[in-house]
Regions:
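PTP/DSP superfamily signal
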Residues: 3, 15-57, 62-156
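Alpha-helical scaffolding within the catalytic cores
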Residues: 7-14
Length: 156
């Protein structure tokens, strides 16, 4: 049959990328929600290990949510003097989602709680970078966010 396809070789994404002579880094993150603190720590450590003027390729399944979250975090790390709103607009204009998007309070859309968390955490990540980039991020995101979420809980 002319429409049959025979798989002659199967590779993981990592095998394919490394087979082309490139380096591969995967950071696990669940779709629709802000990454776990350990994933953000891993990303910050990865960022710190990068040489100057490196090219990176980011993607998730759809190329929007998680991709834009990590691109925004990378942009924040790379450009700490740029206002957060400018970074988020830039990432959106480049084709990503708007990470600080929040639906109206009366919305029944199932993703609303996740949007609220993302908007809160991208602002906190920006603040984390502002406070810690001068020390080379001696304080991990996990430690920093644990202390600041406790502060936020006390304020409520």
């Amino acid at each position: 049959d002319e429409h049959e396809i025979f798989v002659e070789e199967a590779q993981t994404e990592k095998e394919l990328v490394e087979g082309a002579g490139l380096r591969y880094k995967r950071i696990a993150a669940t779709d629709h929600i802000w990454p776990l603190p350990a994933a953000v720590d891993e990303f910050v450590q990865f960022y710190k290990s990068l040489p100057e003027n490196i090219w990176l390729h980011f993607h998730c399944q759809a190329g929007e949510g998680r991709t834009t979250e990590f691109l925004a975090m990378y942009d924040i790390l790379k450009n700490p003097a740029v206002p957060l709103q400018d970074i988020l607009y830039r990432q959106c204009l480049l084709g990503g989602s708007y990470v600080a998007h929040v639906e109206p309070e009366d919305s029944t859309y199932w993703k609303v709680p996740y949007y609220v968390e993302k908007a809160k955490h991208i602002a906190l990540f920006y603040r984390y970078v502002q406070e810690n980039e001068g020390t080379g991020f001696a304080v991990s995101w996990s430690d920093w966010i644990a202390a600041h979420e406790l502060d936020d809980d006390a304020d409520e």
